[in-house]
Amino acid sequence: ETYDVNVMGSVKVLEAARKCRSLRAIISVTTDKCYENREWAWGYRENEAMGGYDPYSSSKGCVELVTSAYRRSFMQDQGVGLASARAGNVIGGGDWAEDRLIPDILKAFEKNEPVVIRNPNSIRPWQHVLEPLSGYLVLAQKLYENPEQYAEGWNFGPFDGDAKPVGWILDQMTSLWPGQKWILDVDMQPHEAGYLKLDISKAKAKLAWQPTWCLESTLKRIVHWHQVWLENRDIQAECLNEIGEYMRDMKHANH
């Protein structure tokens, strides 16, 4: 099912896009897990080998290969810019997905239960959801204006200093929600990469894009968003306010 949805689903979307003559720019979003993880200390660059230990990760590497094939076989001849984007571990308010760190933490907080964690030393490139979205918009504009120059793979991750261990995230979150704690799950767990970072040098140099919010600020915003939701306040207004703050901070950071 994972391969059917991620790989063949992407093929079907790209096949439909190939037949749509009005399209000028397409971004295929995969994940940082598309890279062959070597557990090294450096961030992965866009020209690193695709791979993946598990079906999910390898399926995303496959999507990158599919995207590259469609770009070279079809899209470039039609003058369509087809790029791929690889974001880090995206977090933010309103995420209720299963088996994800931040939602699991908030669910435990709501129940006043300790957070059970399996890999506190795993390092991930955490970033607020608005960060890669802003990068995708910049990339889409560049693709539209100059498809030949920008039709390739791009990383949109945090600054190196915000690639933090899971345990650090838990310590920050429990400090923001007094009375909470976390405990280690000692049972056998599925394989999971211990160290994963993205090199965003290319996006900074060629797109003039860079992250806006630090991880500490992002975690504070997530807790605030969730508390607004728990109090049944206007969550749409909160979302719009957060987007406005991000745009202002991004403009200020780029000047």
Summary of predicted features, one role per range:
Residues E1-E15, K19-A25, C34-V90, D95-A97:
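Catalytic helix-loop patch of NAD(P)-dependent Rossmann-fold dehydrogenases
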